[in-house]
Amino acid sequence: MLAKRIIPCLDVRDGQVVKGVQFRNHEIIGDIVPLAKRYAEEGADELVFYDITASSDGRVVDKSWVSRVAEVIDIPFCVAGGIKSLDDAAKILSFGADKISINSPALADPTLITRLADRFGVQCIVVGIDTWYDAETGKYHVNQYTGDESRTRVTQWETLEWVQEVQKRGAGEIVLNMMNQDGVRNGYDLEQLKKVREVCHVPLIASGGAGTMEHFLEAFRDADVDGALAASVFHKQIINIGELKAYLATQGVEIRIC
């Protein structure tokens, strides 16, 4: 059995790490490189960096900090933000990133997933999915351009359909960003994760809602996700990664102990 992964998420805007609630009202957390180094030293299994306004601004992720991160950490990291071409991806990987993640650009051009997978291998192609639960319809819908409130829109894709589509096209991993839960720290959306797990045959990463160590345990135990991504509980030092991993190990979760 592969070890479960703990993945701090760093949302980047204007060269700094920020964090919002339900993808809105972002506050500045701190500088990118020191935070990345801290999380690596605490025992994170990998890091994810989202340049949250790159796609909505029509630009590629700011590459200046990618190489600096690569110099100070010795764990894998993934970079996302406005990657719309093979050249964009190649540059980010050449600066030291281990994986690239696409989200809004994949919705705009689903063939991008296949082209990236064919060129670089499925192991480094992650597809992020921003999913919103509509209480009126009882359905989960994929959203696009979520880094900019004024441009965020609901797509024609229902979440389960898009999960299956991106796998067919070559996604090597899926990060499910559950927007309703984002930043509120009352637990992952386990029901949604279970439904996605049934149709997801590549590694699945839960994102949005972690507030306690028990929330991580529930995601691993009840929804069988491969990794759990979180931001505010780590940024605000509510949970220490080393202590979290020790707790999960006592609960029988296969985890890499620091």
Curated annotation (Swiss-Prot):
Reported function: IGPS catalyzes the conversion of PRFAR and glutamine to IGP, AICAR and glutamate. The HisF subunit catalyzes the cyclization activity that produces IGP and AICAR from PRFAR using the ammonia provided by the HisH subunit.
A biological process term (GO) from this entry: L-histidine biosynthetic process
Assembly and interaction partners: Heterodimer of HisH and HisF.
Coiled-coil annotated residue ranges, if any: none
Tree of life domain: Bacteria
Active site: 11, 130
Pathway note: Amino-acid biosynthesis; L-histidine biosynthesis; L-histidine from 5-phospho-alpha-D-ribose 1-diphosphate: step 5/9
Keyword Cytoplasm among UniProt keywords: yes
Keyword NADP: no
Assigned EC number: 4.3.2.10
Organism encoding this protein: Escherichia coli O45:K1 (strain S88 / ExPEC)
EC class name: lyase
Catalytic function, reaction form: 5-[(5-phospho-1-deoxy-D-ribulos-1-ylimino)methylamino]-1-(5-phospho-beta-D-ribosyl)imidazole-4-carboxamide + L-glutamine = D-erythro-1-(imidazol-4-yl)glycerol 3-phosphate + 5-amino-1-(5-phospho-beta-D-ribosyl)imidazole-4-carboxamide + L-glutamate + H(+)
Gene Ontology terms for molecular function: imidazoleglycerol-phosphate synthase activity; lyase activity
Keyword annotations from UniProtKB, A to Z: Amino-acid biosynthesis, Cytoplasm, Histidine biosynthesis, Lyase
Listed name of the protein: Imidazole glycerol phosphate synthase subunit HisF
Cell compartments where the protein resides: Cytoplasm
Alphabetized Gene3D superfamilies for the sequence: Aldolase class I
CC per GO annotation: cytoplasm
Pfam families in the cross-refs: His_biosynth
Family affiliation: Belongs to the HisA/HisF family.
